[in-house]
Design a protein with these regions (language model features):
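Active-site PLP attachment segment
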Residues: 85-123, 129-140
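Conserved C-terminal alpha-helix-loop-beta "cap" of PLP-dependent enzymes
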Residues: 166-218
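Anion (oxyanion) recognition and catalysis
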Residues: 58, 85-86, 207-208
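Active-site phosphate-binding strand-loop segment of PLP-dependent enzymes
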Residues: 14-73
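General beta-strand structural signal in soluble alpha/beta enzymes
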Residues: 37-38, 64-68, 91-95, 101-102, ...
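Single conserved hydrophobic/aromatic residue that forms the stacking wall/gate
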Residues: 2-13
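Structural signature of PLP-dependent enzymes
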Residues: 144-170
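Hydrophobic alpha-helical scaffolding
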Residues: 16, 43, 70, 97-98, ...
Length: 218
């Protein structure tokens, strides 16, 4: 990951996702590689060039596996980045409980194309999964997907994701008006990344004075 540190209101980090050029260079250096595994989006909402990376990976005869744990919501609104599921990745793992209305521990594995042996995946899935799966969690996954599908089909009222994006857009506009807090622009608008002189101090103040729980501070 290329990181550039500039001076200003604290340290402002400009992060770029993984590029197709960096993947091509890595595969040229290691032509024996049979798979490429990347995380996109990052925890901070930085998205890599999945389409370009998929093209390079397949050109070298390898498969692309994307950890899209924090991007399960991408498919459900055009204001979010395009999901790796639609960008040519061969396998995509999504933790739907992170950004969608589902129980903790729920996740999905998407397999695309024919480069990955689906029967082999099922074989090892059966070996490593619990012999006593939680039907509550599985029902939660089903209910989550049904809810989102119905939400997208509702053309009359403002849907769940429409309202979510509306609130995100307004929040980001208001944050940009602040004098001592900078909003770091990232690919995923649902990630509110704030840049201040003392992140821990802001974390504690929002939690103790306003009851707002941030995910992390650095």
């Amino acid at each position: 990951r290329d990181v550039e540190r500039s001076r200003g209101l604290g340290d402002v980090y400009k992060r770029q996702g993984i590029t197709r050029e960096s993947v091509r260079a890595a595969l040229e250096e290691h032509p024996e590689a049979c798979e490429v595994i990347i995380t996109s989006p990052t925890y901070e909402g930085v998205v890599s060039d999945i389409k370009g990376i998929a093209e390079e990976t397949h050109r070298f005869g390898a498969v692309l596996i994307v950890d899209e744990a924090h991007g399960a919501h991408f498919n459900f609104h055009d204001k979010f980045p395009e999901s790796a599921v639609k960008c040519g990745a061969d396998a995509v793992i999504q933790s739907i409980h992170k950004t969608l209305p589902s129980f903790t521990q729920t996740a999905l594995l998407h397999l695309n194309g024919n480069l990955i042996d689906k029967d082999r995946v099922k074989k090892y899935w059966n070996i490593y999964q619990s012999t006593s799966p939680s039907y509550i969690l599985m029902a939660g996954i089903s209910r989550c997907l049904t809810f989102l599908e119905d939400d997208m089909c509702d053309s009359v009222s403002l849907g769940y994701m429409d309202e979510y994006v509306f609130r995100l857009t307004n929040l980001r506009k208001e944050i940009k008006k602040l004098k001592y807090i900078k909003l770091q622009e990232v690919d995923d608008i649902s990630k509110i990344v704030l840049v201040v002189n003392d992140g821990k101090n802001l974390y504690d103040k929002l939690l103790n004075d306003y009851g707002i729980q941030l995910e992390m501070a650095s």
